[in-house]
Amino acid sequence: MSQQKGNKSRINVEIYGQQYSVVGDESTSHIRMVAAIVDDKMRELNAKNPSLDTSRLAVLTAVNVIHDYIKLKEEHEKLKESMTQKGME
């Protein structure tokens, strides 16, 4: 189910077997994609750590996703700097 209110989208998604109502500025397809990635990451980590309860699994998922985000952000900054340097030559 999805609704639009102003520029906000409200959509129900399932993450790791739980239903969540998510509200965001992005399209419903974007919100679904984000939810699917979170679900995939949680299932991937659960396969490696089956003894973790859901709360710990969620925190570990958040830590891993933020780690990936920071690495990508650093790589992006290096690429921008490299392009700036090449533009100055």
From Swiss-Prot:
Belongs to the ZapA family. Type 2 subfamily. It holds the Pfam family ZapA. GO terms for cellular component: cell division site; cell septum; cytosol; plasma membrane. Homodimer. Interacts with FtsZ. Its main location: cytoplasm. It comes from the Bacteria. Keywords: Cell cycle, Cell division, Cytoplasm, Septation. Activator of cell division through the inhibition of FtsZ GTPase activity, therefore promoting FtsZ assembly into bundles of protofilaments necessary for the formation of the division Z ring. It is recruited early at mid-cell but it is not essential for cell division. It comes from Bacillus mycoides (strain KBAB4) (Bacillus weihenstephanensis). Gene3D superfamilies: 6.10.250.790. This is Cell division protein ZapA. It is found in: Cytoplasm. The gene is zapA. InterPro entries: Bac_CellDiv_Activator, Cell_div_ZapA-like, Cell_div_ZapA-like_sf, Cell_div_ZapA_firmicutes.
